[in-house]
């Protein structure tokens, strides 16, 4: 698979379960709560630093295997 990349959470809507990550290079990436690794309530906060892999989703590139760093 792809190499891990780093980025920053642009925004995340807890009610809808998705948001966007701004990678260190490239365009913003869609992120779904199912792609967040960890236990419990899966959410991200604006400005959080994250690492992830880029995968092809239904509507283009998106972040997967997201971890807060």
UniProtKB/Swiss-Prot annotation:
Kindly state one GO CC term assigned in the UniProt record. Answer: cytosol
Q: Induced by what?
A: In response to low temperature.
Principal location class: cytoplasm
Between which residues do disulfide bridges form? none
Please state where this protein is localized: Cytoplasm
Q: Does the keyword Flavoprotein apply?
A: no
Tell me which UniProt keywords the record has, alphabetically. Activator, Cytoplasm, DNA-binding, Stress response, Transcription, Transcription regulation
Q: Name one GO biological process term.
A: regulation of gene expression
Q: Under the GO molecular function aspect, what terms does this record hold? A: DNA binding; nucleic acid binding
Q: Which Pfam families match?
A: CSD (PF00313)
- Matches recorded under Gene3D superfamilies: Nucleic acid-binding proteins (2.40.50.140)
**Locate the CSD domain: which residues?**
7-66
Tell me the PANTHER family matching this sequence: COLD SHOCK DOMAIN PROTEIN 2, COLD SHOCK DOMAIN-CONTAINING PROTEIN 4
- Listed name of the protein: Major cold shock protein CspA
Taxonomic source organism: Pseudomonas aeruginosa (strain ATCC 15692 / DSM 22644 / CIP 104116 / JCM 14847 / LMG 12228 / 1C / PRS 101 / PAO1)
């Amino acid at each position: 698979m792809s190499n891990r990349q780093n980025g920053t959470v642009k925004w995340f809507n807890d009610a809808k379960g998705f948001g966007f990550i701004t990678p260190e290079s490239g365009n913003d990436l869609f992120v779904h709560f199912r792609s967040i690794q960890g236990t419990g309530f899966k959410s991200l906060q604006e400005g959080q630093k994250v690492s992830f892999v880029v995968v092809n989703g239904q509507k283009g590139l998106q972040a997967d295997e997201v971890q807060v760093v």
